[in-house]
């Protein structure tokens, strides 16, 4: 069975030949390995090793689930040879009979979870040969002797090619930044060197300071000080005096079965006896005694109540777990055979009555008639407006109707606009009456004579002098 970790085991076996003092240091010493001492692996090898460690520590049942899946597939395909290989490979771990009573619950897994007892090694943490035949027994024993490192130790010891190349790029960028801003770090380096020289104990001949400053340098010089730059933060020195953190994976499971049947049965019986003694002689809210007296016993057995037949046992239920062959129907509240047990009034929208339905029908019909009348009136007005022109007069119209249409057509046409687009004779600035009517005298009337107010203005006078715009005044005109 090819599972992740086949080549990862060879990786850890090759690194297992390190001196024993490295293994004795433990995770605390390995976590602080410098980045330069990390071993660079291929991307596929690094991911496979990381996947193996994570699967072993956090998902130990994945291997058994994969074996179970392959066993079921082989059984479905009738591959007896594959079934035999899986049974031989996992038979030693699955064939052990536990002497402790089984748990009160049954898990759906076919392969049992290995039980962990105090003083015994964790079975899930032991690496097994994956994807190998039984002939490689020696290699499997050698692999079982060398435990795989934890996740933190693996990340501190190994890195991928992408991570290593990224670190190199960051180092090169940092060196370029220092070279570009050498003036920023030169004074800081000189100060650190001078301070280091002052801390060293010179010989007796050089203890006399010949050229010294007026005061003692107590202020530490820093290029990026906290006044002009954002502070970099205080180093967390508190973690240096604490024990290194470690993930204890065995704490996620019980060392022994906490739900023992014998212990649980005795505790339940004791709790039931105490509860019955506490409720002895008390009356519930329904007026009945909480623990009624026992019925007479015959041969150690008490009487049981006569079973009452439940109606509709053999009938088809309202809902089944089968497939729905058509659109499901909504069950109304009145059609449901179950009685509503919720006390108090319930909200329900009643169906409209016959009178209300008749009123709505009449209102809809009246509204439809009104809309039809309105549409017909609008259509007639549109047709009339389109035909109210002297050129559009029908010869079938009577003379009186033609004069009426000619007289009313002037209300819907703009004579001034028509005159601006058509040539006209010499215009006069005097006021005139509409065509066909009596003309207004051009001379000034006598004081006592009656005058007539012009009804309309000359249509040609509306568009006269439109382009004769007044000249814009200059600044010199105001002085």
Swiss-Prot record:
GO terms for cellular component: nucleus; spliceosomal complex. Keywords: Acetylation, Isopeptide bond, mRNA processing, mRNA splicing, Nucleus, Phosphoprotein, Spliceosome, Ubl conjugation. Residues 455-466 have a biased composition (Polar residues). Residues 7-19, 433-454 have a biased composition (Low complexity). Pfam families: Es2 (PF09751). There is a cross-link at residue 145 (Glycyl lysine isopeptide (Lys-Gly) (interchain with G-Cter in SUMO2)). The modification Phosphothreonine is found at residues 3, 389. This is Splicing factor ESS-2 homolog. It comes from Mus musculus. The gene is Ess2.
